[in-house]
Amino acid sequence: MSGSMAQAFAHNFLGQSPRWYKASIVAFLLLNPPLFFAVSPAAAGWCLVIEFIFTLAMALKCYPLMPGGLLLVQALVLGMTTPQALYDELVHNFPVILLLMFMVAGIYFMKELLLYLFSRLLLGVRSKALLGLLFCFLSAFLSAFLDALTVTAVIISAAVGFYSVYHRVASGNDPRQDSAFADDQQLPALHHDDLEQFRAFLRSLLMHGAVGTALGGVCTLVGEPQNLLIGHEMGWHFADFFSKVAPVSMPVLAAGLVTCVLLEKLRWFGYGTLLPDNVRQVLANYAAEDDAQRTSRQRAALLVQGLAALILIVALALHVAEVGLIGLLVIVLITAFTGITDEHRLGNAFKDAMPFTALLVVFFAVVAVIHQQQLFTPLIQWVLALPADQQPGMLFIANGLLSAISDNVFVATIYITEVKQAFISGQMSREHFETLAIAINTGTNLPSVATPNGQAAFLFLLTSAIAPLVRLSYGRMVWMALPYTVVMGLLGWYAVSYWL
């Protein structure tokens, strides 16, 4: 009985995850206490960061919330950080949590409009290079004024819509019914090749869109949370921020868009896959049927969604309230004026975002450990000890490396605080202070596309509903982001070092 009970516990632990994965998590949990007590808390802290990155990298084996959560519970018990420090980190990042709770749900209620608009774009543009460029540019443009997570949620919603329509039709189901589309077992063998090609096609568009959020987000005061933080510390307004950062952001934006076209033309790094003709036909038929069968109530609903989208853009651009609260406004407007009053239908809108919201809390616990154990402090002190002319370039590199494994806002906060203290104490001129602030801003935004945990939008994409459907793993995201990382990182470093 005891043997079977032990087997049951072992089987239940992390569910269907591979045995080697379960053994790895157990090994991590056994390794951390001796490291903490026998070596040093800092060594255990760095080990924890690496272990958490491992759980993110294996997201398709097991959702990172469970193994990452176990590691962070242990970190709290050991004293690597405190519940109060975690709470303070959550309060500091509460706008992001609000955004995930309400904005992503708000986008869910706009999915009919998004599917309508994106299907026109997808079916109307036959050149894959032009389509990739449009996705990248539109994401960059929107992210300069809206939040990157909001833009990513829009792209994910559209991709899930396309995938579900084709998968249901290919499986012999009604595309308008809520049938499962994650299981390929009902799919006839003749559709498998088309589905694999369609997955590769969607992967490339998703990655172009995700990189676009970073290209546009770096440009303006409202593009990323850390931009607002740095702008506040420097006393820069919208126009000031744009003009100060432009010598770096504009060349990088142009280079990023050129990279997008070249990747599609050369078909490198998993890009260049075309939309299969059979899939195009299915989507075109669906769009035509939708147009023919659309009732006056459905047209009215589309109109309401369009007006809500307009209100959303204006409200975000003018910053009338926190992003999450604007998302709640969108939910209220669309549901009230389209007749969605059933609690179950409302609940479906929150299903996708809540697991990621919980995972983000675990991520902020890692940030709290980094902060409390001062894991980044030696690197910061080393950069500020360099000659003044070397500091901008090295600050860009240091920011990029740390932002690739940690939270952008956290890294920017630490660096701008340290640099401002040095400025106040008379260690540098105002001009040099501004140059370093630009290096911090661009360093936290551009090279951090290297890994999914470097950008919140990338992490959201990795752990979203679309990632397992199109086989977008951590490793594949790193590989597909690599050319962008090299171009954006090298040009960004050169611009910071020689053009400011």
From Swiss-Prot:
TM ranges are: 34-54, 62-82, 90-110, 129-149, 150-170, 205-225, 241-261, 311-331, 350-370, 394-414, 449-469, 477-497
What are the disulphide bonds in this sequence?
Answer: none
Q: Which Pfam families match?
A: NhaB
InterPro entries xrefs:
Na+/H+_antiporter_NhaB (IPR004671)
Reactions catalysed, as given in the entry: 2 Na(+)(in) + 3 H(+)(out) = 2 Na(+)(out) + 3 H(+)(in)
GO terms assigned for molecular function: sodium:proton antiporter activity
Q: Where, subcellularly, is it found?
A: Cell inner membrane
Q: Which UniProt keywords apply?
A: Antiport, Cell inner membrane, Cell membrane, Ion transport, Membrane, Sodium, Sodium transport, Transmembrane, Transmembrane helix, Transport
Q: Assign the protein's first listed, main location to one coarse class.
A: membrane
GO CC terms in record: plasma membrane
Membrane topology value = Multi-pass membrane protein
The UniProt entry, under NCBIfam families, shows: PRK09547.1
Mind telling me which PANTHER family this protein's record contains? NA(+)_H(+) ANTIPORTER NHAB, TRANSPORTER ARSB-RELATED
Q: Indicate the family of this protein.
A: Belongs to the NhaB Na(+)/H(+) (TC 2.A.34) antiporter family.
Q: What does this protein do?
A: Na(+)/H(+) antiporter that extrudes sodium in exchange for external protons.
What name does this protein carry?
Answer: Na(+)/H(+) antiporter NhaB
Which species? Pseudomonas fluorescens (strain ATCC BAA-477 / NRRL B-23932 / Pf-5)
Which gene produces this protein? Answer: nhaB
